[in-house]
C-alpha cells in the first residue's frame, strides 16, 4: 500500500468477490466526504421524492454518464461516524457478475473517486480509531478463514478480545512503571519500594504473556492449515483414498496403473485444521511423455507438502518400488497407509520399523479414514494436547509479545543484580513499546504498510 495515498480522497472499490461466474449480488463501496454526492450522481431512486437517510436502503437504477441504465440496484448511505471507517460510507448493491459491477465502479471513478488500495478501508477504520490493529488483522483473518475454528478465533479478535487483553497488560505495566518513576522523582517523599510485592506483580504479568504466547502455534495451524500430498506407486489406491477422505469423487479410479496423470486437489477440515489434499500421479519410470510430466510435477509438489501420505498395496506387500519412494521421502513428516488390508496375506507385511505413523485402510470402502485423521493430528501437533482457543496470536503479534517478555526478563535480571531503578524503567518502557506495536498504539508507517498491503481491495 502506498503510504502517500491522500486520506482526504474519497475511495471506491468492489467489496465482494469478483469471479468469472455470475454472482447473485455485487457491492461497490465508497468512503470519504464525497461518497454520497458521487452515489447521488449515478444512482436514480425509483421514488421521485426519495430522501437520502443514513442507514436506509433506496431502490432504483444505476446510470452511466449518458443517462443509460446500467443496472437495477439498491443504494445505502452511512453517515460518519456511524460507519466502518468513521467516514461517510456509501454502497451500491448491484446484480453480481463482472461486467455490471465493474461498470458501476467505473462510474464512481468518473465522478471523482479514487480506486482504493488493498486494505485501505480497514486502514482508515484503524487511523480513525474505529478499530485497533488486532481487530484490523482479524478482518483479514475472518475473510481468509478456512475452518469454523479459524473463523471463531478471527471473530473474537474482531470483537476486540485480543486487543483488550493486550491493553490490560499495558495498564498493569504502566502501574509498575509509575511506582518506579515516582520514586525516581520523589524518592524523599515516598516510602521504600516493596520490591517483593512489585516483583510478584511483574511475574504475574509474565505468566499472562506466556499464556498468550502459547496460543500462537495452534492459531497459526488453524489459520494456514497443512498441505498433504498422497504419494506412492501407481494403482495402490491413492485416488480411492482421496475420494474417501474428501467425501467426493474428485479423482478417477480404475484398475489401470497411471490413470492419474496430473495432481488432483481437494480441501477439507481435519479436527479443526484446514487441509489441502493433493492426489499425485503414481511414481514410476514411464515412456509416456504425458505421464512422465505428471510424475515430475507430483515429485515437485511432494517436496513442497507439509505432510506426505505414502500409500502401499497390502496385497502386493512392501515392494522394491515402495522402498525406492520411501528412501526419497523418509526424512519428511510421513504417514504410511497400508491400503487393501482386506486382501492382505494372513502372515502380515514386513515394514520398515522406523515408520511411526501407520494406518491400515480399505480406501474403496472408506475404512481407515478416522485413524488417518488421528495420525495426521498427532503428526502436525507432535502429540501435544491442543487447547480450544478463543483467541490466538499471529506471527507478527507473537514476535512483538516475545520482545515484551524479553524486556521483562531483563527487568528481573536488573532486580537480581540490584541495579538502580533507572535500569528497571528502561526495560519496562521497552516492554510497553512492544505491546503497543500489537494494538497499533506505537507502530511505524512501514509496518502498517506491510500489514494492510496483505488485505484484498475493498476491505
From Swiss-Prot:
The lineage of its organism: Bacteria, Bacillati, Cyanobacteriota, Cyanophyceae, Synechococcales. GO terms for molecular function: GTP binding; GTPase activity; metal ion binding. Its main location: cytoplasm. GO terms for cellular component: cytosol. Mg(2+) binds at residues 239, 260. Binds 1 potassium ion per subunit. InterPro entries: G_TrmE, GTP-bd, GTP-bd_TrmE_N, GTPase_MnmE, MnmE_dom2, MnmE_helical, P-loop_NTPase, Small_GTP-bd. This is tRNA modification GTPase MnmE. It comes from the Bacteria. It is an enzyme of class 3 (hydrolase). Its cofactor is K(+). HAMAP family: GTPase_MnmE.
